[in-house]
Structure formats: structure tokens, C-alpha cells
Amino acid sequence: MKNKKVNENTEKLPVLNFNKQYMNNTKISRILSTKPILLDETYAQLRIEINDKIINLVDVWRDENITLSRDDITPFDLAVMDAAYTIMCSGKMILTAEWIAKVLSGNPKQKITKKKIEAIRQSIDKLRYIHIQIDCSNEFNYRKDTKNKISDFKYESYLLPLDKITAVYQSNGKEIIAYPVLSKPALYRYAETIHQIVDVPADLLDTHEEYRDTDEAILIKRYVIKRVAQIVSNNKLNSNKISFLWYDREENEERGLFPELGYIPDNTRSWRNKKQKINKIVKMTLKSLKDKGAIKSFEEYRENDTKNPAFPIMGYKIFYGL
């Protein structure tokens, strides 16, 4: 009787419908998905400097006696979390890998492969067992609206606080896996509080007419669209550039699309071919944004801002407004 009820509930999952996509824009989310963090049963504590006066302490650890598919948090995992949060914001309190795949691509009619579903499920099952605690007491005591009002403030949850339901139909053996939402993830509650959630019209993610939605293409286009949203919203940015690679002297680290999506440039032919492929996806994504009216225009820029085609393309300048 219990299995029958589960089957009926799963079979009646509502149709996914959303007008916006949401992306975590906090420094914490970037550090988690780009820095080597060993996940084990003890705390891995990160000191994340928001500015010269604010330091947040972030603890990350996994459940005991659990073997993860990977012992790190990847840009793909962050994209899965963003997609899950987008679904939650649409009012749904149950998730499926199929839904997340459609949100990731931005194409609700996309044909989802078994390989992609399995990759998303592995990511979800990993994120369900990783804890995060964000001690933002220092930040809250610096903010004008909460200064000297709160002595201690922490957010804590799993990276994706989800239950799991598995149902197999007797008639055809089809397996359905769904994930009921237990609570909003701490990383996103924190982002909401400090107004670091980027939102974009959902149709901007639909680029299937420009190129095929491989896992790599999805991560690249989401990076580009998020960066454009940051530029257009004037989120305290002094640059209108989408850069492949630049050095942040204040943070003493490499920034840009390459390091933030896990690419390691070298002098091999393989990397030169890969770089051309990445550039093509970036350029076609920007063309799609221009065609949809999200930006006015864009142009490539080269090393030292020269127009000489002998110098490598370093990224693109974005132009928007009237």
C-alpha cells in the first residue's frame, strides 16, 4: 500500500514552469566551487574575506561513513544548486534530475540523455551529504541595518537539504527518483540576506538554436549570462568585460572564465583547440543575448587592448543601455 501511494504521488508531479533563473553570486559560492577543498568527516574551515573589514568563517564537512562520487565541489555542482534553487523559487518543493537538466540548459523541450540524468543525480546525492555552516556574525555586525544588534549569526544546512523517493513501476520497470525539499539551502538563505542572488529571464538560457547543450557548453553559457547580468545590473562593478583570464592583485588570485570553470591553460595544441571552442560558445551566447535585446552589442578585446589580430583574444566588452 505504501509503495502504491509513493507511485501515485510521483506520477502526479506537476509540470515545471518558471520565468526566471536564479544564480548564487556570493564570494562563498565561488570559492567553494573553484578552490581545492578536501571533504571529510572533520571541519574544513575557510576564512573568506568579503572586504578588509569583513571576514566570514565557513565550515564544510560530509556525513560520516559516506562515500562521495567526488571529494570536491565543482562548477557543475554549483550549477545544479542554482537550478534546484530556481525550481524552489517557482514554488515547487520536490525536485527531479530531469527538471534540473531542463533548467540547466534553459530549453524546456530538450531531450534529456540517461548520461546527463546520471551525472545530475550523482551531484545531487553528493550535495545531500555535505554540510555547510556560514558564520556571518562579523558581516552582520558591519551592516548598517544589523550593526550592534546581533552578536552571533550562523546559517547551517546541507548544501542541498533534500529527502529522496525512489519508485519502480511494475508495468514497465521504469524507475522514478524524486527529491522532496526539506528546507531552503543555507548558502542561498545567506545570499538572499546580502542581496547576492542574480536573476535573469529564463529564455536567455535557451540557446539550442546556437549550439548543442553539452555539459561544457551549459557551464560556459551560464557563466557568460551571469557575468552579463552582473554588468547590466551595475553590481558595484568597474568593468564591462567578460575576461577569460586576469589576475586579481587584491585577492592575489587568478580570475576569469578559465580558472572559475576549472580550465588550466598551457601551450599544447589540445589547449589551443579547446580555447577556440570555448571562445566560440562565448561568442554565440553573446550573439543570442544581443538578438534577444539583453545587451546592445559586444566586441572582443585583445591583450594590451590592441587591435592587432596577432595578439590573443582576452575576452569581450559588453555594451548595453540606450
Predicted regions and their residues:
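Charged, alpha-helix-forming regions
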Residues: 1-322
